[in-house]
Swiss-Prot record:
NCBIfam families: PRK05231.1, thrB_alt
Organism: Caulobacter sp. (strain K31)
Family named by the database record: Belongs to the pseudomonas-type ThrB family.
CDD domains cross-referenced by the UniProt entry: HomoserineK_II (cd05153)
Domain of life: Bacteria
Encoding gene (name): thrB
Gene3D superfamilies in UniProt: 3.90.1200.10, Phosphorylase Kinase, domain 1
Molecular function in Gene Ontology: ATP binding; homoserine kinase activity
PANTHER family to which the protein is assigned, alphabetical: AMINOGLYCOSIDE PHOSPHOTRANSFERASE DOMAIN-CONTAINING PROTEIN, AMINOGLYCOSIDE PHOSPHOTRANSFERASE DOMAIN-CONTAINING PROTEIN-RELATED
Record protein name field: Homoserine kinase
One matching Pfam family: APH
Length: 320
């Protein structure tokens, strides 16, 4: 989450005039993440999150995201349900940009996830996959494997600027991933950005909720697990924590056992998931607005994860 769009008191009052939420009491920006502008709003009736959609958010995709959040909440999954205005609309406009209000969810993210957090996060991810079954809308993964080569072609010079020789290494990775990419795995709604800052825990350490579904799409469930392994199971020194990974997968399988094909696919999917986040971080590196309250994330963090996958895919003991 971040803040790229400033909102005046008058603009906020006019926006809230369409809702039955009372008057604004407090309103402040949330300076985390890199995608949208987010604000914590407190009114005389409760607390909410106002999101103004920026950057990659395509207006035509927003109904999918908001309807998905409503679907998940209505099916018992702890996600931030969008708030409808008096006319029943959840997708609104402020300062000429699409915007939405959602419920404020209690809980805290884990800044330094433990093995226990990983187990809980894994179970929460499986719960999400099951809760999304039957959601009628569809959205292709526009940051999935078929799009990576095209994305990289726009940023080859940026890669070389970060690390001489990196472009050739990435070209080789992309070719190998294209040849080995799994097909036909169990699929459905995935989060696709299930990072520690998008998962909340209760005070006792149990899973509380997931937020920030604005990369959600239809893809292989095991790919979502791979994204999550990369996000949760690498230590600050770049080493892979296999104990945390096994705990995460065990937590997942509390609710949804993996098929043999999914287990076998996790190593290549994890390599691909590292590629996806390397590429989007590379794209963000030179394009984050100068006045934003956020720094772009280091693409080389995910290049180092790619290096681990190149040399030691057996680290992913999904079946262990």
């Amino acid at each position: 989450m971040a803040v790229y769009t400033d909102i005046t008191d008058d603009e906020l009052a006019a926006f809230l005039g369409d809702y039955d939420l009372g008057q604004a009491v407090a309103f402040k920006g949330i300076a985390e993440g890199v995608e949208n502008s987010n604000f914590l709003l407190e009114t005389t009736t409760g607390r909410f999150i106002l999101t103004v959609y920026e950057r990659r958010a395509k207006p035509e995709d927003l109904p999918y995201f908001l309807d998905l959040l409503t679907w998940l909440a209505d099916h018992g999954y702890p996600s931030a349900k969008p708030i409808a205005d008096r006319s029943g609309a959840t997708l609104k406009t402020i300062r000429g940009k699409p915007a939405a209000l959602v419920e404020f969810l209690p809980g805290l993210s884990a800044r330094r996830p433990t093995v226990a957090h990983c187990r809980e996060a894994g179970e929460g991810l499986a719960w999400l996959h099951l809760a999304g079954e039957g959601y009628p809308a569809r959205r292709a993964n526009d940051l999935g494997q078929p799009h990576w080569a095209s994305l990289f072609s726009k940023h080859r010079k940026d890669a070389e600027g970060l690390k001489p020789g990196l472009a050739a290494t990435i070209d080789k990775d992309l070719a190998e991933l294209a040849l080995a990419w799994p097909r036909g795995l169990p699929s459905g709604v995935i989060h696709a950005d299930y990072f520690p800052d998008n998962v909340f825990f209760k005070p006792d350490g149990k899973f509380a909720a997931a937020i920030d579904f604005y990369f959600a799409c239809d893809d292989a469930y095991a790919y979502d697990i791979a994204v999550t392994l990369n996000a949760w199971c690498f230590e600050s020194d770049g080493s892979f924590n296999i104990t945390a990974a096994r705990a995460l997968i065990a937590g997942y399988e509390r609710r949804r056992p993996l098929s043999p094909a999914e287990r076998d696919a996790i190593p290549i999917l994890a390599r691909g998931a590292a590629m996806r986040f390397f590429l989007t971080r590379l794209a963000d590196w030179g394009s984050t607005p100068a006045g934003a309250l956020v720094r772009p994330k280091d693409p080389l963090e995910y290049e180092r994860k790619l290096a681990v996958h190149r040399e030691g895919l057996s680290l992913f003991g999904a079946g262990a």
